Amino acid sequence: MEERLRALCDLAVSGVRENAGLHEYDGRIQDLSPAGVRAGLARLDGSARRPGPPGPGRSAHDEAHLAAFEALARVELGELEEHRWNPLLHLDAMDLSCYDREYAPATERAEARAAHLAAWPDAVDAARESLDRVPRPVAAALLPAVRGLAAGLDPADPVAAVALGAHGRLVGHVERAAVSGDPDAALGGRALQRLLGVGQAMPVDLGRLEERADAERDRLRAMLDDACARLAPGHPTAEVVAGLLRDHPEAGAVVEEARMVTAEAIAFTAERGLVPGLDGECVVGPAPPSRRWALAMMSWAAPYEPDAPSRYYITPPEPDWPAAEQEDWLAVFSRSTLPAITVHEVAPGHFAHGRCLRRAEGDVRRTLHSVAFVEGWAHYAEEVCVEEGFRDGEPRFAAGVALEALTRVTRLAVSLGLHGGSMPPAEAVRRFEAEAFVYGPAAAAEAARAAYDPTYGRYTWGKLEIMRLRDRARAAWGGGYSQQRFHAELLALGAPPLGLMGGILSGSPGTG
């Protein structure tokens, strides 16, 4: 691998290992100590300053793509020093779940997992040294994840026993921050603007983005109202939504229903040609224990791995949960929302996108994936299915898409408000309840996520930028426009920074 790209990957080990399939990093934990981060940034700066031509065969577009990711690393770890206030970086580095998927023989993965686990004590020492300014809301929101990191480890195993001791020290460190940390987790408008814009290679006007979020919320609410009026004329939307969420498969049938919707979504995507060259196998099944924190997720066969089935994981409720908790969990898999979730996770969403990434040209496109593009594409895919008449345009599906989208647009509004200082935490919870039909503990958890995931509005932002580019493509290409052409040219870029997508119109980067 070329030196600049290697220096960048060394600063994003867990991400490139799992999402790009760079398994030379197996068994290793990124050094997130203060000295380790400084050394990594120094290598990054040294490789970027070294004179020489672009990497072999690298286009100007890919050069800009690489430069945006380099700039983002400097902002996250240099300017904002996220390793000092966000335990999530350290949790991601220590996470063992990356070895569960069958990308290599079981013995090889077991050896890598054991080496990774043996490195936990050093990783915890680095985390405790770095995490010296964790805000109280960040620590409180992440404590369950910190405690759950060691789930399933066997204390009778000598390596695991040492790792568990280290894990206890990390839990104690974060517990103390949850009591004594700064009560204010806001980054400030300038920091949020840098965090959003630099990695996407585009200027960001937070005020304008907030206006766009409000307009999108209003559009989505109208979409939901229309769907509910078609389903139950004369009944209030909230009443219809409550009924839709109560209509779900039983816990033991959720995975099978997801399997059927997956086949339907793949067939529809292929029939309409919504994603070029859709191939590969998508296996649907219950999430392994290490992934049960997610209700539904895609784990794709990554670009640098041998081809293998991608995994669409579904997490039904635990059978020993109280009945009310099981019902709340199953509402996510209602017959309105499960199809929306599935087209997002599978096709034309993440699974289909992952297949395109395996065919992307060049190391930059195969390795560096803009999360705002990845999630924006999958969220956009939901609305494309509504436009294209998935399930013959049934209003139940449109209602499910609108409900999912209202949660995501509320995340964008809340992240802008909380980190910009204009929205108190109680107002953030109220927004989810009033505007997204998310209530009680679920609304509180959604609002709390903004503290440690300040860019979690990326789903809506990415979707809006793709839709805006689509309008421009229609105008620029005229009679040569088709949905198939737009998707093919866009996905050929891999998962680019949002600000570079416009290169498909002009043939040059940075015009988005």
Feature map (PLM): residue ranges:
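N-terminal maturation segment of proteins
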Residues: 1-512
